[in-house]
Amino acid sequence: MTDQLRAKFENIELNAGLGKISAFISMTLSLLCLFGALCFLFPSVLTTPELRPLYSKHSDLFYFSLMAGIIISAGFGAFSAIVRQNRYGFYGLCLALIAAVLGCGVIQAPVLPSVPFYAGFDYFVLTLIILALVFIPLEGFFAKNPKQKILRVGWVTDIKYFMFSHIGIQLFSFLTVMPIQYWITHLPSNPIVPWVQAQPIWLQFIELLIVVDFTTYWLHRAMHEVNFLWRFHAIHHSTEHMDWLASSRLHIVEVLMTRFIATLPIFLLGFHTSAVFAYLVFISFHAIFIHSNVRFRFPYLRWLIATPEFHHWHHSSEKPAIDKNYAAFIPLYDVIFKSVYMPNHLASVYGTVGYKIPNSFVKQFTWPFKKYIQRFKQHFGKPKDPL
């Protein structure tokens, strides 16, 4: 099924006049509306608890947005199906109708028992819409590689990573934050915490950038230099086309390790919640920006903050660029520890060297364990019949 999706929807040119653009808009928007309708039906299990007060306060606005999205997706689907005779436009129209039935209040959802766990469907939908509205036009007007398609090779796999990381946000938080919180409660009080918390929020924000980037620099470097860790990080480097969606291609083991290492100094030093929130929003957007297909170079900032030019070289498969530019935000760490590579021209080829990594989301998940799975089969597998 995954191979069929990639064959049908990857490396496609959205040419005007063939109904492809309207069909793509219809299918994408109707799927998001379907997720949104499910969030209205089952808010206790499909929405993020921190955002529920916002939904309650502006329920009319969100409901209007859902209905508007359904109408727009149905309109594009009908145009593509009827005028251009594109079957995917018909599929988008059908999905829009299903979303309308679920979202209009005709179906009464059963009352679900209160559970401590949730799936962040709302977080996935809202984040995808915002990022797509920002980065698709940005990459269209300022593309580093103008020939790269929006539906380029690998985007189906990357959207699955994006979806998994956003819907499973509670799982990631539980597996990283909870152990740290438990451990810190058993430590003696840190005398630095009151001093940190007494500082203004803007200063704490800057300190967060410096401290967290220092810890993640060494983890990132270890992922390149330690073979066991590299097998997980290689998944991120397997993309051969850089854009905003490529930043999502991260193995779950790498996500857990990075979030744990990044979260540890935040709790140990006791940064204020407002500073942490500002940091998370900023660094999340920045991480997507430095992967995006844009030609911005920022010559006066290139050693102060990581730019797309800087990080694209980290992903380059050119020999001089391999195992360089580890910093996520502060390039000076690479300068100090002699791991920087910034020539005067832009990177042009990407991917891993010497590794054949599968394209499938599921196969990429199991790829780092392939060697150990084979060893297990050799030791415990059924012996072959000598006859």
PLM feature segments, named:
Residues K8-G36, S59-F62, R84-R87:
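N-terminal membrane topogenic signal
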